[in-house]
């Protein structure tokens, strides 16, 4: 199943890591381990952020996705299960509508 992981980086320690020249290597190490389907870095509420699409085969792996961001950046992580159009088609919405209407 696919999951969206939203990451918000506080200014510190990120700014210090940028000044030290180590932030790039830390992010590379995390991404090498995370292996996201895709990831985009952006601004979120005035701070740095990222949105990743991750394939989750085993829910017990979720801490391994977020802990590197928590421990290296004091970041906040949010998770949302995501469906493709094909997944949504398999959801049986018509039947659910009939059952619960």
Give residue spans per PLM region.
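Conserved, structured core segments of small domains
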Residues: 1-101
